[in-house]
Amino acid sequence: MLPNFWNFQFIFVIFCWIPIVVSDEKIVLKIGSISSRDNAKMLESILEMAKKKMTEQGVLGEKLDIQIITVEGCGASFEGVAAAAELYHVQKVDAYFGPYCSKELSPVATMASYWNIPIFAYTATSAEFANTKVYKTLLRTSFQSLNSISEATAAFMAHHNITKAAIVANIGTDSFEKIQSLEKALRSRGITVARRVMFEEAASAQDLVDNGYMNELRDNARVILPIFSSTRDLSTVFRNATWLANMASPEFIYINPLIVARNSEEPPVFYGKMAQKSIKAENPNTIQIYNSYGFSDDLLNEFLAIFDQNQRIYIDEKDLFNYVALYESFCVFAKLTEKYLHSLKEKPEDGKIRIDGKALWNMAVGMTFQGVLDNVIFDNGAERMTSFSAFYVDEKRDQIRTVSLINSTVTSKNCMDPVCIELVVSDVVTKFWSSPSGKLPDSEPECGFREENCDYTQTIVIATAVVCIILTVFLGIWLRRACETSALDKMPWRVFRDDVQILDEEQVKSVVSLNSASTKMSQVETKLIKNHAIVGVNTHAVYDLYEQRQNIRFTREDLILLTKMKQAVHDNINPFIGVSFNEKSELLLLWKFCSRGTLQDVIYCEKFAMDEKFQGAFVRDITMGLEYLHSSPIGYHGGLACWSVLIDKNWMLKLTDYAVCDPLKRWEKHGRINCKVDNEAEKQWQKMASLYVPPEIRTANEKNRLKRMDQKWQGQTILKRQQSDIYAFGVIIYEILFRSLPYDEKVDLTELAQKAAEGDKIQKPSIQRNKKLNPDLIALLQDCWSDQPDMRPTIRRVRLATEIALKTKGNLVDSMMRMMEEYANNLEKLVGERTKLAEEANLRAERLLFQLLPKHVAIELKAGRTVAPKMYDSATVMFSDIVGFTKLCSASTPIEVVNLLNKLYSEFDTVISKHDCYKVETIGDAYMVVSGIPIENGQRHVANISAVTLGIMDLLKVFEVPHRRDYRLTIRLGFASGQVSAAVVGLSSPRYCLFGETVNIAAVMESSGEGGRVQITETSKILLENEYPEFIIEIRGINKDVKQDDFVTYWLTGKDEDYFKKKNNTFDF
């Protein structure tokens, strides 16, 4: 007998070797957890906690249970590998959880793949475990791996259009593995690795600068990826090197993927506030790519809440991600096992169930389940897809900011695998970078790192061109000013005194009578007769004469102003002819003569009846002229009054005496001219001019008058003078509407004007109580007379308001133009009607053409194109002739014959229109019809012609001759089938004609036939028998009229309408 010890061992081995036995009560599975010596108890507790969770959810229970076997590994002698073998051979486990350490995971996963046992790697981070050809049953549930965080980093960079980057790392195996994984992910996104800078781990920050590593990075990249192993914290060293090399500015982007290559490494950060403080101190102003929960306490708090419900054991927070991954791994295994057992179609004969590792792996592909915090997705390689985030370490803020979310989603776009996962980057914050724009800088300078992308030749050429252009502009300005000065010095507006012929009173009356129109309105008496002159040969002008006491020297401003006045051209501006000065002690201002005098003459002429049309037209002309002056280089009028508005022979108002008021006063102040006049009427109205001047201008004028000659003349801005024009325009509107000034009738206007001229404050213009006026115009006038210049409306607003209130659409001439326009519109309407009639006639002609010729032939001929002859392989041609038509014609008048044929052929046309046939022509009583031409219709042409002939025969049975009701027409019909040629014959009078043997035979069939019968050829008979047997045919015999031997013809006698019913009845029988 065996000793007791060996007997016990043998029994234990035999018991453990027995596979899972399926009973009606429960299936028990075994899992082997290979932990480390330090945390074996903790890992076992987490598995028990997960088992309890699955039991509560009903996954485990009466029918399924999982037995947890924990062994220690991760020792110096690969104890975990031996333990894995023992678990398989002795314990007969159904799945592995672990090993906890990476060095033992690879051999255990290889053995599990060979044994077809599922293995859950909850701490696997190395990229080598992504090889599904080697690790066929490995399911990775770890929160992050080299390939996953590398893909997340590449996705973030591609989302921000980063195309080039450099990698800096220390020399070492772990760093090399990280670099390989990261470069692979970058290449897949089209991102170029410009440089890979490697340095010794013992290097200091100063060494990195002195050895040229930092310069190499600066010269090749603006986006830098620091990848360091965890054996020594090099992040601070590299960060100090960036400060020493002046590379800590926002011009450079540091993207730090927090990668853990192996489980033996400590994670670069933990989570929560401690992690934020650590990262901010070591990596300010950088972007960290890390697990979405890496800088938050959410995962820890949620897991602690679950853990505390079971047992209170201290949790090493550094291993939090591994603990959560182990917890979720057990839940995944339980759910997959349940699904796997349900997928078994039948129980094995021996009742023993073995877990198929590869089948379980396939079930995990694309699986989604609820994890501790969110849903967990397995990709096409049965690897957990973790949610990552991009964190911006802003040294100016207390907290690390989440700028982008990098989530995994299932997609079917351009995917051939069973399950495809796509990384989707969504921005949380868009403008976060510490730059003026808040956006990430470009991955490469615009001109390249060595200015290789910029051709400075072009810049130099452009700079030279710009300098040349600037010099040219300055030279042009100088030349323009010189030319302008030369032009001003030439004084185009100067009129020499010898060119001016002063007219006396008799000469003026003679000239005015010749130029004035003979209308009742030409008899207006003028209260103020200006001086008249002839300038040059025949230019009739009026002038203002001033005594000149000293020679006048014009300033540059005076020269520019007078030149602008000479150049002013507008329908409502009176042309300025020029100035005669420094001759005969006289200063003459010459303006073009307007035959109907001034607006003042019309307003205060009692004989002249001024209706609303005149008022509206006058106001409109003044506003148009003022608007032109205000928008022109002159800028203002400066002396607007009712006598400075002239009326030409077409009753169009023209502004005159513009822009000269200020120079005249200045010259008078300096003693160069005398503005006093001798004419009493003119003196009176000269005094009244102050009533058109606003208060602020009157005050300024009085101040200028009181100044000494050596004191500077106080001028006014263009805007102030425009506002002054609006004030005067308000007064003129009132005069036009009411033929009086806007003051009370009891007021002495002469005294009021004297006070205004002396600068005293006088009453404002106002609308008198007995005057009725449009409310809009009342408001407009009150605005025009406002004491505050800035409150006065612009001339554009005045024009629009007066056009609406006075309903003006132009001057008096415009009314006549509108009548002519209405006539033109009526003429246009008449032309349109006639054009419509022509189009209708054209349509009728077109319809007639389509009746004479086939439609497609007519379209081609209308387009000017020729229609080529065409041979038709199969068609049927029919001829008809009325028997005894000649005799009938001899007994009838021509009109009766025409009416007969018109009625008969109209009936024939009706019969033809019901079938696919075309009437070729009619000659007297002969009628020619074809089917299959010009549109081919297979073999249906013979049936169409047959139906037409029978229809004509039926028609004639009831047809009555209009002028002989008792007379019955008899017709001969004949047709033939075969080849026919068709062509258009003639140019000026085209005809559509048919040619060929078939046409000739069809004519013989008609001519050799009998009245009231239809004669057909044997070809037509064969087509009817083969294709349309419902038609009734009788043989006639050999027709000797046809020049062919033994030519047999037939009679078409009718159509059996019940043919197909009889045929169907025969078949049914």
From Swiss-Prot:
What are the annotated disulfide bridges?
A: none
Residues annotated as binding Mg(2+) 2 are 881-882, 925
Q: Which residue positions carry a glycan here?
A: 161, 240, 407
- Provide the species name: Caenorhabditis elegans
Question: Which residues are noted in the entry as Mg(2+) 1-binding?
Answer: 881, 925
* Chief location category: membrane
Q: Which residues cross the membrane?
A: 459-479
Question: What topology in the membrane does the UniProt record assign?
Answer: Single-pass type I membrane protein
Location of this chain's protein in the cell: Cell membrane
SUPFAM superfamilies cross-referenced by the UniProt entry: Nucleotide cyclase, Periplasmic binding protein-like I, Protein kinase-like (PK-like)
Boundaries of each Guanylate cyclase domain copy?
Answer: 876-1006
One GO cellular component from the entry? plasma membrane
Give the main EC class.
lyase
> Start and end of every Protein kinase domain?
497-806
The name this protein goes by in its record: Receptor-type guanylate cyclase gcy-29
Task: Describe, from its UniProt entry, the tissues in which this protein is expressed.
Answer: Expressed bilaterally in ASE and AFD sensory neurons.
Q: Which residues lie on this side of the membrane: Extracellular?
A: 24-458
| Gene name of this polypeptide | gcy-29
Annotated signal sequence is 1-23
Q: Which GO terms describe its molecular function?
A: ATP binding; GTP binding; guanylate cyclase activity; metal ion binding; peptide receptor activity; protein kinase activity
